[in-house]
Amino acid sequence: MTILLVTRSFVTGEAMSESEKSLYDSKENVLKELLLTYGIDSTETQRRQLLKHIELLIEINKNLNLTRITSIDDALVLHILDSLLPLKVCNEFTSGAQNYIDIGTGGGFPGLPLAIMSDNKTLLVDSIGKKINAVQSMIDEIGLGERVRAEKLRAEEIPNDYKQKFDFVTFRAVAKTNILLEYAEPFLAPQGTLIVMKANVDEIELQDASQAAKIFGYENVSRETFELPHDLGHREILLYRKVGKSKIKLPRKTGMAKSNPFVARRD
């Protein structure tokens, strides 16, 4: 018996055996307690949907490389908890139905878990079409298609109707922070928030990010650190608010942000 069968039958409402229900309940309780340990409240429906995401991810991953994490217990920490840590530092994220984009979403992280835990109208983008097709299928299976969708898109290729549209932008371990500040700026509405999720941030990266923030019209709101359970890693979340206009026209040509990034002067 596997958790895949358990969550599928539970979410779709099909009848489960007692052993199946017991196994599902154990994972749902583990997730509930895990989130509560970090001060994150969740409903039973949200936990069902979060588990459904992991179920679908593991199943699709058999044929398409979306993640190296194939253990349900590790996925609860490294995918679900990790994705939801921004809720600890950005209360505004769940304050109403807002526009949110997750860039470089991969297997739907952190965007899909954050969409599950909020009422935000959510767009998940990635440059790889196969990943986007998989993520859209997961969105539909979970039942969030009315307000969440996936689209193939590069960070530097911004349709006009996406410019200055989003209240929140997230990146999870995609690139250095100064580069992410540049990528996000054209998407963000005035006073919008960029949420950067990293494993480790050194002093040089922070200095470069500070310089880029001045150029692109941001203020640094906060830097918070977390330790994942079971020694599964250190996490940092940086929040930036768009408070002014960029001093240069963005986006630059494709590839320029990485090949010629804005950095702090080195003495």
Question: Where on the chain are the PLM-derived regions?
Answer:
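Class I SAM-dependent transferase core
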Residues: 17-20, 27-95, 137-144
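Conserved SAM/SAH cofactor-binding pocket of Class I
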Residues: 84-175, 181-184
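N-terminal amphipathic/basic-hydrophobic helices that include classical n-h-c signal peptides
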Residues: 1-15
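Helix-to-beta-strand junctions that scaffold the AdoMet/dcAdoMet cofactor pocket
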Residues: 188-190
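Short strand-turn motif at the edge of the Rossmann-like AdoMet-binding core
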Residues: 174, 197-201
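Short, charged/polar "capping" segments at the starts of alpha-helices
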Residues: 202-206
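SAM/dcSAM-binding transferase cores
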Residues: 207-267
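Residue-level signal for inorganic ion chemistry
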Residues: 57, 114, 198, 240
